[in-house]
A protein has these predicted regions:
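Intracellular effector-coupling site of seven-transmembrane GPCRs
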Residues: 56-65, 207-251
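Loop architecture of class A 7-transmembrane GPCRs
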Residues: 2-11, 83-107, 129, 140, ...
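Intrinsically disordered regulatory tails of 7TM GPCRs
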Residues: 1-11, 49, 211-235, 296-317
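Seventh transmembrane helix
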Residues: 198, 245-246, 252-256, 273-317
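Extracellular N-terminal segment of 7TM GPCRs
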Residues: 1-41
Length: 317
């Protein structure tokens, strides 16, 4: 009886860990399916629409980042929550996978963040210079390339510093504490600076939309349609920013607490780390829902793709 009672809490913790991992993996699977759908919708639109606009390409870029993020973190959810981070594959092959895994984990989040900033810059150009095409298709592809290159350069030192660390019989893929603190602080700075830039850009966009004067040769109907489209996109992008930072804030709080040496305050809160991970994973689920809610054309195209028909109207114009 004594042995049974001693093993009961262990069994309960194991069951709880499996339940948490299952929930996280389910959320990531939904995120994967939704973002694949987004890419398919935009691909159909890109092939058939005469307006291959930058918004659609940037949204597709966010979805691609979310797809990679989901694929990478589905096994991670089980590894972190059930195996306590124990890295099963070791040796030279395991070491290479460890370095690649940590490298990709940094890239996907920063890429999504920089792409949202790129959309803000694009919308600023559209609103302030409606008759000039400043961001061409070629420029757009170059910006997308930069949204992957900049995070890759930031994460490049991981290939050197990532290694196996053994503690209490568990081998994890990680960085030394001091290196981790530097990366966490750098990541926080990137998110803060991009947020600050987006706030300035969208404040300027909102001010311009509020006091905009259209040329006399634009009809009332065309003016109303343009205003409505700009307002819808403006609201959608603001919601994207709020969702990204709301979902990232808990994990960012954990990382900063570690970098600033008060991590113990949060580590003692039993479920905080799980909630932080779940919130982070939910962002990939929320983004496609935002596209559907705020964009009628995208909503229509989703229905047509699901019914195996083609969408021929421009999305995110």
């Amino acid at each position: 009886m004594e042995n049974a009672s001693d093993s009961s809490p262990v069994h309960e913790r194991k069951t709880e860990a499996i339940a948490k991992a299952t929930l996280c993996m389910s959320v990531l699977a939904v995120s994967l399916l939704e973002n694949v759908m987004v890419v398919l919708v935009l691909k159909k639109n890109f092939r058939r629409s005469p307006m291959r606009n930058a918004n659609s390409l940037f949204i597709a870029n966010i979805s691609v980042a979310d797809i990679f993020f989901a694929i990478q973190n589905i096994p991670h959810a089980y590894n972190n929550l059930v195996l306590n981070g124990h890295w099963i594959l070791q040796g030279n092959f395991g070491t290479v996978l460890c370095k690649i895994d940590m490298f990709l984990s940094v890239i996907t989040m920063v890429t999504a963040n920089l792409t949202i900033l790129a959309i803000a810059i694009y919308r600023l150009c559209v609103v302030f210079f409606p008759l000039r095409k400043i961001i061409t298709r070629k420029t757009c592809f170059f910006i997308i390339f930069l949204t992957w290159l900049v995070p890759a350069l930031f994460a490049l030192p991981i290939f050197y510093f990532a290694k196996f660390i053994s503690n209490e019989g568990i081998t994890i893929c990680s960085l030394k504490d001091q290196v981790r603190k530097i990366f966490y602080a750098g990541f926080a700075v990137i998110l803060f600076m991009t947020l600050l830039a987006m706030l300035v850009l969208y404040a300027a966009i909102g001010f311009k939309l509020w006091r905009r004067n259209f040329p006399n040769n634009i009809s009332e109907r065309a003016r109303a349609l343009r205003e409505k489209r700009n307002r819808e996109i403006f609201k959608m992008l603001i919601t994207l920013i709020v969702a990204f930072y709301a979902c990232s804030l808990p994990i960012l709080t954990l990382q900063l607490s570690f970098a600033l040496d008060f991590y113990v305050v949060y580590s003692e809160t039993r479920h905080f780390r799980f909630i932080a991970l779940l919130m982070l994973f939910l962002n990939g689920v929320i983004n496609p829902i935002i596209y559907i809610v705020f964009n009628r054309s995208f909503r229509s195209c989703v229905k047509e793709v699901l019914s195996k028909r083609y969408c021929c109207q421009p999305v995110f114009a």
